[in-house]
A protein has these predicted regions:
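Extracellular/periplasmic catalytic domains that process cell-envelope and extracellular macromolecules
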Residues: 4, 26-27, 60-61, 111-115, ...
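Intrinsically disordered, low-complexity domain-flanking/linker segments in eukaryotic proteins
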Residues: 148-149, 153-160
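N-terminal "domain-start" segment that seeds a small globular fold
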Residues: 1-25, 162-164
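Short, P/G- and charge-enriched loop/turn segments at secondary-structure junctions
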Residues: 1, 106-108, 174-178
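Short active-site neighborhood of thiol/selenol oxidoreductases, capturing the structured segment around
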Residues: 21-53, 65-70
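Alpha-helix-centered segments that form part of catalytic cores
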Residues: 113-131, 157-186
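A short, hydrophobic beta-strand/beta-hairpin element that forms part of a small beta-sheet core
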Residues: 11, 119-124, 140-144, 158, ...
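Structural microenvironment flanking redox-active thiols in thiol-disulfide oxidoreductases
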Residues: 46-150, 172
């Protein structure tokens, strides 16, 4: 896991779906802004993505690189590579995104009213198998609860059991999403000209 103020490691990506393949180490001294979203995330398409598109259009030639990363930490049947490819080629959306955008009149014939103009990749998704290690659970907990070690033992055991249940329910680990300790979608990753993580 990377912290704000540290060197930003390259994103772990599965497949580039739109635009030229890139990563932090290939973008020189540009500021890097990464929009992390899920295909099945209404808020991503209603609020965050239009803002990121505006930023991209305003600053794309002025030392800012913008790209998108579609991830999946839930709804694995909807947040798929296939649905991302369909979204980027046809503008068609699925699931809760389709329902919400339709309800608010933000679709034209079931398709987005805008195109995503910047490069987009799919997060690297690793199939979960077996029991989560104590070390993995501890790292996850301490990222969420920094004062975990000072808590009573019975409370700590309850938290471990909840986290174990959570990890068992996960079908995949989304490597970029987890490496940057993102809490949900939409999220952004901001890296400065020197490659230092400035905000998530």
């Amino acid at each position: 896991m990377v912290a704000i103020g540290e060197k930003a490691p390259n994103l772990k990506l599965g497949k580039w779906v739109q635009g030229m393949e890139t990563n932090f180490d290939k973008e020189g001294d540009n500021v890097k802004l990464v929009e992390v979203f899920q295909v099945n995330c209404p808020g991503c398409f209603m609020y965050s993505m239009p803002e990121i598109i505006n930023i991209y259009q305003k600053y794309k030639g002025d030392g800012l690189t913008v790209f998108g990363v579609a991830t999946a930490f839930e709804d694995y049947d909807k947040n798929t590579l296939e649905n991302l490819e369909m979204l980027l080629t046809t503008g068609e959306v699925v699931g809760d995104t389709k329902q919400a955008l339709s309800q608010y009149g933000q679709l034209d014939d079931g398709k987005l009213q805008f195109k995503i103009p910047y490069p987009v990749a799919m997060d690297s998704l690793v199939k979960e198998t077996g029991e989560p290690s104590r070390e993995k659970m501890t790292a996850f907990i301490k990222n969420q609860l920094p004062d975990f070690d000072s808590q009573p033992e019975d409370y700590k055991q309850q938290i471990f059991e909840r986290v174990k249940t959570y990890f068992k329910s996960k079908e995949y680990s989304a490597e970029t999403f987890e490496m940057y300790s993102l809490q949900g979608t939409p999220s952004t990753i901001l890296v400065d000209r020197k490659g230092i993580l400035r905000d998530v």
